Amino acid sequence: MSKLMLVSAFAPVGHLLGRIEPNLKGKTVTFIPTASMKDSTGFFNRMAKWKLRALGLNVQEIDVAVASYHDIKTNIASSSMIYVTGGNTFYLLQSLRYSSAGELIAQAVREGKTYIGESAGAVVAGPNIEYIKRMDSEDPAPYLDSNYAGLGLVDFSIVPHIDGPALGESAAEIMRHSNSDDHMVPIRDDQAVLVNGPHIELVER
């Protein structure tokens, strides 16, 4: 049974994690900051690890762009949850693909580990990330070769930062160019999509 928490920003809604992952204290989370390494505001994305620690979690950080396959596999295997930060979505997808971390994550989620995706981390959870071009630059990911297939953890696409002060207009533009067949789910920074098996709900802090 798949369990996911997909957010624009984790800090405002992190306390909602307990709805899909009870008894957080003492559990371990794999923290993947890779997307934030190619973002001018990456430091703020990485601050989520302090929120995770405040919830009682042990944080194991690993950058999949530079870590070995063995280290990534070991890190994920020893965790109860996987957290993927915001940042540049295209660089994140490229790194997940070339390190094979994406396959390891998808398998772990299928086996019951909870996936927490923030902004870029939420976008890559869907079937395809091409739509996020209106918000993110492809420049940091020259080896994607126009293959925008996401991890496919869910069958819908998150549009983060709707109504936000910085990226709200980009999010609105994505929605203007979408249609019902695209299965877009826009979320504000104070909202989260919680997936618990067949149950999917949009919640607010």
What role is predicted for each listed range?
Residues S8-F10, Q191-A192, N196-R205:
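Patatin-like phospholipase A catalytic core
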Residues F90, A122-A125, A192-L194:
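Short, active-site-adjacent cap segments at secondary-structure transitions
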Residues A149-G197:
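Conserved anion/nucleotide-ligand pocket segment
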Residues M37, G87-F90, G121, D163:
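Short glycine-rich anion-binding loops that position phosphate/pyrophosphate groups of nucleotides
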Residues Q94-S95, A101-G164:
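Class I SAM-dependent methyltransferase SAM-binding "motif I" and its flanking Rossmann-like core
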Residues M1-M81, T85:
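N-terminal beta1-alpha1 cap of cysteine-dependent amidohydrolase-like domains
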